[in-house]
């Protein structure tokens, strides 16, 4: 249950944004493009030299079990997050991680707003740019998304629904 979910304040994802994630849809009992999502998650973890600790089939089964335990079949957005694990102390060196990876699966019912379907969304081109791949690879769904958060804030202040970020 949501009110019982807990993650350590020493988790590397919380302290440093050290983790990867995927957004997955559940529609009519099927996980949409699950193989591609898991492949990208594992490739992202590999790029960060991070072990997930489960085989892809095992992780898929955990996602399915979580949705089944919550009686969810369709119209569900799943945020799958994996962090390096718990740190001995707040410090960026991965060698001080003292636990297995933390895996979080959050399934939620998310339907588009009627106004979005009718009118679309308003975009605002923000001054915040996407980073170069050698700084923050855009192909990685990493937890550290501060530039995206800054872009959302700027778009909201401009009266837009979403930010449009340009490449460097």
Which residues make up each language-model segment?
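Conserved alpha/beta cores of soluble small-molecule-handling proteins
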Residues: 1-164
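Short, acidic, Ser/Thr-enriched surface-loop or helix-capping motifs
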Residues: 166-168
């Amino acid at each position: 249950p949501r009110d019982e979910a807990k993650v350590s304040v020493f988790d590397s994802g919380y302290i440093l944004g050290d983790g990867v994630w995927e957004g997955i849809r559940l529609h009519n009992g099927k996980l949409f493009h699950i193989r591609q999502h898991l492949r990208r998650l594992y490739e992202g973890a590999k790029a960060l030299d991070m072990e997930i600790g489960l085989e892809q089939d095992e992780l898929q089964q955990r996602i399915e079990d979580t949705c089944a335990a919550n009686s969810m079949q369709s119209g569900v957005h799943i945020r799958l997050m994996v962090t390096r694990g718990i740190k001995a102390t707040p410090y960026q060196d991965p060698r001080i991680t003292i636990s297995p990876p933390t895996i979080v699966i959050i399934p939620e019912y998310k339907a588009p707003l009627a106004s979005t379907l009718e009118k679309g969304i308003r975009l605002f081109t923000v001054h915040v740019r996407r980073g170069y791949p050698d700084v923050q690879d855009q192909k990685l769904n990493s937890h550290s998304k501060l530039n995206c958060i800054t872009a959302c804030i700027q778009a909201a202040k401009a009266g837009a629904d979403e930010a449009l970020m340009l490449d460097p």
